């Protein structure tokens, strides 16, 4: 049964092949009248090949009368239902809806007018589909061609074509090519364009020829002349269908280019002018020419030249580019005595070469020019304008001073003789080497020439000489050239074979070395003349061509010797200066090594070499260690606190340097907190013995009288001096002195609270001894300052009342018109707004200070009454103070927590108030004042200060400040107990600081 299955399958396969072979898709086309089939024979089998074209259609026409333009047919149509479908341009691609197909019959129809310029042809894809929509045939590509019609005119690429041609060009020379296009079908009669010239401007003889089909514009003749017609305008037409169809016009602008075909000609046949002799001018004459070529071109621009007569090069001709004129210049002065008139000829040509068409016709035509020279009175001049001098060979460059070169005189051009009344000076004189005699014009050297002088160029020195006419002031300039020989040129250098020799040797070899090999020996060595005073006489013997042996006639002792040698070559040339050689002679050891003169172990070999040394490893290590320390130092600086650590201790930061200001203003170091009020210990006053002697404790007080004055000196160097009833003294703990003379008594003492000492009084008749200690302030400055201030205050007190201090008024309100503060009443309207009740009193801290300043301390009045004959101080430390007064004395003692004392005496001479001097130094202040009513010499009181454990305050010169701790005594000397003396402070009008 198996073979039956294979037989059935084979029969079915053969049947399918037969169906496929006999089935086909055919295209039928009808003629114009639909009667016969064209393009493809009907019902012919093409073996599955499709026809690729259909009936053509004409553009811009209604082609519907030709429908159907094609018909497609499939062979499967006989056995099954076939549906036809088309696609492509004109169907489902732009332009849409041009073609349609009958899906049952396969007829293709055109439904719209087409444009060939937009779509030259259409490609239509044809499909044959079964009922399932599947292709039963391979798709067929159908081409529909569109026939062209002449519907487009030619188009030129430019509306105006520009061209140019040189004048005198040969005929048939190409000028330009015109270009036009047609949108109709290429290579068709509809797109074939023909050109022709419609018109020419300027009208006349046709000058150009236009090719009909190529559009080339050529010259018709060779007679184009730019000077006659510089440009042409052509109107050109282009028509399709070889000139029978549509046409278009354009313009052609043709410029005729200029060529140098015209010769320039002088406007005048001859020219003449005149000029004064010895003068120059930039425009003596202008020449005009005529040239017909195009202006401001090289064909028009003239070039002037001399044909004869300007052999002396007196004249030049320059062309003016704006006018094309020739400008005659005089560049070299004319001499009337030599030339009374100058005649020359000129010619002209163009800058550009002449055109080949006329170059054979050009001939040089000369135009004569005559220049008359006018005679004028001439001055001086150098003839010749330059002169050369030569320095003779063999002279040294170091011996040129006063070397005479020669003379160079100016001449009078009217007489051609040496000019008179002329002064000569040097003009250009580089380096100031030369000098000319003002009268004789003799030139000589005034300086020697350095070996490397930059003023010598090519062995020549150039300078200028000026001759000044003393009558007219005119100047003539001449140039001189000084030729100098080659100084030191290739001069040999003499060297010693050894720089040092032993004292046992008496000879050394010298050699000559030449920088240039071509100057070789033999050389002759000779010694300069030697003085008889020299310790050693030398001689020299020639060894060979370049060496000699230098011998000493006597025994050499250690030291340096200088020998002068002269070297002469084979041509008798020698150096300008002798060569100076330095030879060292020294003591040598058994190894012939020269020992140095300093006695150390430094040796120098006789060959000039020193023992070599090297840097050891230890030295290298030290260098590296030093570098590391330098690098470590900045790092250590970064660890410093710069004073920001806590107060005290190791890291307490920087400690401020004491400046002495702590005694005046206490530095609390805080803001806002009130200072602590402390009591000040009273000043201790030593008692007085019954015998009148001073009781002292290690005070070292001694007295000496001189001229009624007193010197008060501290242990540290403080010194106060008073004399003739008026004194001012000041001193600092560091040590200084001040002295003042006649006038009111004022005193100032300054001392640091941190120092102590004993003040002693010395009285002498010869002078005052001043002991100064170490101090940070200039003693001379302080001495001068306080002395001047004391004199000024004293003189001021003598001539005016003391009204320039702080005055106290009973009433300072509005009712007191003389009150200096009466105007303060204007501020009474703010009394309600500001609480100024705190101004009614000074408070507990300043109350004592005010009592001390005003002298109203009640406690002092009650503690110690004042008697007529003596004044006793307070007794706080077991001491007392007594002062003998022969007359009535009114005094007060002020005691308080501040421990201050003040004494005053009544006198008609004293003023009520004292001017306020400015304090200049912080510290303790003390005033000692002495006055005598009888006029006799009265010695002042003595004040001795010794340190205590507490601070004390003395009010002086209106300044309250702490002074040094006091533990001494205050005592009036015995010599002053019979006089009127007082110890006082300034007026209560003092200011507080």
From Swiss-Prot:
The signal peptide stretch is 1-23
Membrane spanning stretches: 618-638
GO CC, sorted alphabetically, is:
adherens junction; bicellular tight junction; cytoplasm; desmosome; plasma membrane; tight junction
| Extracellular face residues | 49-617
- Residue ranges, Cytoplasmic side: 639-993
Q: How does it assemble?
A: Homodimer. Part of a complex that contains DSG3, PKP1, YAP1 and YWHAG; the complex is required for localization of DSG3 and YAP1 to the cell membrane in keratinocytes. Interacts with PKP2. Interacts with CTNND1; the interaction facilitates DSG3 localization and retention at cell-cell junctions. Interacts with CDH1; the interaction is required for CDH1 localization to developing adherens junctions. Interacts with RAC1; the interaction is required for DSG3 translocation to cell-cell junctions, organization of cortical F-actin bundles and actin anchoring at cell-cell junctions.
Q: Which PANTHER family match?
A: DESMOGLEIN FAMILY MEMBER (PTHR24025), DESMOGLEIN-3 (PTHR24025:SF3)
The entry's protein name is Desmoglein-3
User: What organism does the record attribute this protein to?
Assistant: Canis lupus familiaris
What's the source species' lineage? Eukaryota, Metazoa, Chordata, Craniata, Vertebrata
């Amino acid at each position: 049964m198996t073979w039956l299955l294979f037989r059935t399958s084979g029969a079915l396969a053969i049947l399918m092949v037969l169906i496929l072979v006999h089935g086909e898709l055919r295209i039928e086309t009808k003629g114009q009248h639909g009667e016969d089939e064209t393009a493809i024979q009907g019902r012919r089998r093409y073996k599955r090949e499709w026809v690729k074209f259909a009936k053509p259609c004409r553009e811009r026409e209604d082609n519907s009368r030709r429908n159907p333009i094609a018909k497609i047919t499939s062979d499967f149509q006989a056995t099954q239902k076939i549906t036809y479908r088309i696609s492509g341009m004109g169907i489902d691609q732009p332009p849409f809806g041009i073609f349609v197909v009958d899906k049952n019959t396969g007829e293709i129809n055109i439904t719209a007018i087409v444009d060939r310029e937009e779509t030259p042809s259409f490609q239509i894809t044809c499909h044959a589909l079964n009922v399932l929509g599947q292709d039963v045939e391979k798709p067929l590509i159908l081409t529909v061609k569109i026939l062209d019609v002449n519907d487009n005119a030619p188009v030129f690429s430019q509306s105006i074509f520009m061209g140019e041609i040189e004048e005198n060009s040969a005929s048939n020379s190409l000028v330009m090519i015109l270009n036009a296009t047609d949108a109709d079908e290429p290579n068709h009669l509809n797109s074939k364009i023909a050109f022709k010239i419609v018109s020419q401007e300027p009208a006349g003889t046709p000058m150009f020829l236009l090719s009909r089909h190529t559009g080339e514009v050529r010259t018709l003749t060779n007679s184009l002349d730019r000077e006659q017609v510089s440009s042409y305008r052509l109107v050109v037409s282009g028509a399709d269908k070889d000139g029978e169809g549509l046409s278009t016009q354009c313009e052609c602008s043709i410029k005729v280019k200029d060529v140098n075909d015209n010769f320039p000609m002088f406007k005048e046949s001859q020219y003449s002018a005149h000029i004064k002799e010895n003068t120059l001018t930039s425009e003596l004459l202008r020449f005009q020419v005529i040239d017909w070529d195009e202006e401001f071109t090289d064909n028009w621009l003239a070039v002037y030249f001399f044909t004869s007569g300007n052999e002396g090069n007196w004249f030049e001709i320059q062309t003016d580019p704006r006018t094309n004129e020739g400008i005659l210049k005089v560049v070299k002065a004319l001499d009337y005595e030599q030339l009374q008139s100058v005649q020359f000829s000129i010619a002209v040509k163009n800058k550009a070469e002449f055109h080949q068409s006329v170059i054979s016709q050009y001939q040089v035509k000369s135009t004569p020019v005559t220049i008359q020279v006018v005679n004028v009175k001439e001055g001086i001049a150098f003839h010749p304008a330059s002169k050369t001098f030569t320095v003779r060979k063999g002279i040294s460059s170091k011996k040129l001073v006063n070397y005479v070169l020669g003379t160079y005189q100016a001449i009078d051009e009217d007489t051609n003789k040496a000019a008179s009344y002329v002064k000569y000076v040097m003009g250009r004189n580089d380096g100031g080497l030369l000098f000319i005699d003002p009268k004789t014009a003799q030139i000589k050297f005034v300086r020697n020439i350095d070996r490397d002088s930059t003023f010598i160029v090519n062995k020549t020195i150039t300078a200028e000489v000026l001759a000044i006419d003393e009558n007219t002031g005119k100047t003539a300039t001449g140039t001189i050239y000084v030729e100098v020989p080659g100084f030191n040129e290739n001069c040999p250098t003499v060297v010693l074979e050894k720089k040092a020799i032993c004292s046992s040797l008496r000879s050394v070899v010298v050699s000559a070395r030449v920088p240039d090999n071509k100057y070789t020996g033999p050389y002759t060595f000779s010694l300069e003349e030697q003085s008889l005073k020299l310790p050693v006489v030398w001689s020299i013997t020639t060894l060979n061509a370049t060496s000699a042996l230098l011998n000493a006639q006597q025994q050499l002792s250690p030291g340096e010797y200088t020998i002068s040698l002269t070297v002469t070559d084979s041509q008798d040339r020698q150096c300008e200066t002798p060569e100076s050689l330095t030879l060292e002679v020294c003591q040598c050891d058994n190894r012939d090594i020269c020992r140095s003169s300093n006695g150390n172990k430094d040796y120098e070999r006789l060959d000039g070499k020193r023992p070599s040394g090297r840097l050891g490893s230890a030295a290298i290590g030290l260098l590296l260690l030093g570098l590391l320390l330098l690098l470590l130092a900045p790092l250590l600086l970064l660890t410093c606190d710069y004073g920001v650590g806590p107060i005290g201790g190791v890291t307490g930061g920087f400690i401020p340097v004491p400046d002495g200001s702590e005694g005046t203003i206490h530095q609390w170091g805080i803001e806002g907190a009130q200072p602590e009020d402390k009591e000040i210990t009273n000043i201790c006053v030593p008692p007085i013995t019954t015998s009148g002697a001073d009781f002292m404790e290690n005070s070292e007080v001694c007295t000496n009288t001189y001229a009624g004055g007193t010197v008060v000196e501290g242990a540290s160097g403080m010194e106060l001096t008073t004399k003739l009833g008026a004194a001012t003294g000041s001193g600092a703990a560091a040590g200084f002195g001040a002295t003042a003379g006649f006038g009111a008594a004022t005193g100032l003492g300054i001392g640091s609270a941190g120092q102590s000492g004993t003040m002693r009084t010395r009285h002498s008749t010869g002078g005052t001894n001043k002991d100064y200690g170490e101090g940070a302030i200039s003693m001379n400055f302080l001495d001068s300052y306080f002395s001047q201030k004391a004199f000024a205050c004293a003189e001021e007190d003598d001539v005016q009342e003391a009204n320039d201090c702080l005055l106290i008024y009973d009433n300072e309100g509005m009712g007191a018109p003389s009150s200096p503060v009466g105007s303060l009443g204007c501020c009474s309207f703010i009394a309600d707004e500001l609480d100024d009740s705190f101004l009614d009193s000074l408070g507990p801290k300043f109350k004592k200070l005010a009592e001390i300043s005003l002298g109203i301390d009640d406690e002092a009045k009650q503690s110690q009454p004042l008697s007529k004959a003596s004044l006793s101080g307070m007794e706080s430390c077991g001491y007392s103070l007594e002062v003998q007064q022969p007359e009535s004395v009114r005094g007060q003692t002020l005691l308080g927590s501040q421990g201050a004392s003040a004494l005053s005496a009544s006198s008609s001479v004293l003023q009520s108030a004292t001017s306020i001097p400015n304090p200049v130094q912080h510290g303790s202040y003390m005033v000692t004042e002495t006055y005598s009513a009888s006029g006799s010499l009265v010695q002042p009181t003595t004040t001795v200060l010794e340190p205590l454990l507490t601070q004390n305050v003395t009010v002086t010169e209106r300044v309250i400040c702490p002074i040094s701790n006091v533990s001494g005594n205050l005592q009036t000397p015995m010599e002053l107990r019979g006089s009127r003396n007082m110890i006082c402070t300034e007026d209560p009008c003092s200011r507080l600081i």
